[in-house]
Amino acid sequence: MDVAHLLIALVALLGAAHIGGYLFNAIRQPPVIGEILGGLCLGPTVLGQLAPGAQHWLFPSTGPTPGVLGALYNIGLLLLVYLTGMEMRGRRARTERRTVVWVAVSGLVLPFLFGLLVATAVDLNGLAGPHGSPATLALVFGMAVAITSIPVISRIMIDLGVIDTAFARIVLAVAVVEDILLYVVLAVTLGMAQARTGDSYGLPKLLGIDTVGESVAYFTIAPLIFMLPFAWRGRMLFDRLASARFNLIEGRAPAAFRMILVFVMCVAAIGLGIDPVFGALMAGLCASGGAREGANPLPAGGGGSGAALREMTLAFFVPVYFAIVGLRLDLARHLDPVFFCWFLAFACTVKSISVWLGARLAGQDNSSAANIAIAMNARGGPGIVLASTSFAAGVINENLFTALVLLSLVTSQAAGAWLGRIVRRGLPLTVPEKPRPQESDEAEDAARIPA
């Protein structure tokens, strides 16, 4: 009976997620919104109001079903972050470097700082979880304002047929820089929460790190030490492991080899005392752009040896993860409309103005800067990962968890609608970068030199 009950719950979650994703994809909106709304319909917000007995029977709080769904939720989270790492492959914006630099600096530093300032100026203690503190809450708030979604925005641009444009190169290059830096900040935040509770594990526990100051220092350095070697030589290491003679798994089941890589990297991250999502991120970076993975971005194509894992992840694990995120939302009890409205307005305004300012300083015109700003506002998967990990660590409570998830959904939908409107009108998303005066003078001098 327990197995039958679990299978019924999985069928309901998977079916609701895919139906919701299909409907939103049909209206040219990010499928992730539909997948979460599918879970929302099965949770206390909808089904719990219409038929509370059926909702409690389908998703009980005790027994084997919640344990298995919790495990699938965590695996889906790790594989989603793995795919995010796969998205961080080299779409190099060589001719748009000035825009990338200005937008990355202005669009990350300013929103994060403004988020910190508001979080310290406004009393947000009512949004802290059992292990949260004013400092960790402020860091989560700042990250929520500054974060950008690589998977969602890349999927939007693929669907619109603009993935090979200068606009896509700018947005994705900036998003990669932002997300990597914000993942490091997330490691510091979770480490501070560990120090507050004394529930450290791995190397920090062996070293006896138990003060906030020691935790901040350790969790700033440890993720960088863990990330840098794999970001620098990870692809080469992956190719060597995949092509090694002793690697019998790659030839027989490439998806199994990649899943083993993800889990091994997650265990290594846990051994260092940092959240396993960093191991999944590094596994994705190692596997991205390798000789066996093909050159096309993940959502577009399906080529390469890792296609089977990607298809299984997007068909099962990620929809179940997003559906459970929706299932855990209780809008009737944990949505504060006043807080969410000003939080949404503040986050979107600060992020948009900061990105717009950076793009304008780089030489983009008003419309191009606005397009980049709205695209960079899509928080999507990373915003939901931030909500999930900080809520699981006890840094935030259900009210802020709900607000962060809704912020990710609304901004992703808005970015998709805006960019779709621009493309359908045949308007340019960006203008070519204008050469600097020095570069123009050098070009004119070169033209005057006789052949």
Predicted regions span which residues?
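Membrane-interface helix termini and inter-helical loops of multi-pass transporters
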Residues: 52-64, 122-132, 195-214, 243, ...
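Structural signature of hydrophobic alpha-helical transmembrane segments
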Residues: 1-13, 64-81, 133-148, 215-227, ...
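Transmembrane alpha-helical segments of multi-pass membrane transport proteins and ion-pumping complexes
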Residues: 13-22, 40, 44, 48-49, ...
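Intrinsically disordered, low-complexity non-transmembrane regions of multi-pass membrane transporters
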Residues: 199-211, 235-257, 291-306, 424-451
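Juxtamembrane and boundary regions of transmembrane helices in multi-pass small-molecule transporters
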Residues: 120-125, 189, 193-197, 214-240, ...
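Transmembrane alpha-helices that form the ion-translocation and gating core
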Residues: 15-26, 49, 90-160, 325-332, ...
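Small-residue-rich segments of transmembrane alpha-helices in multi-pass membrane proteins
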Residues: 35-47, 102-116, 173-187, 247-266, ...
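Membrane-interface junctions of multi-pass transporters
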Residues: 42-99, 239-343
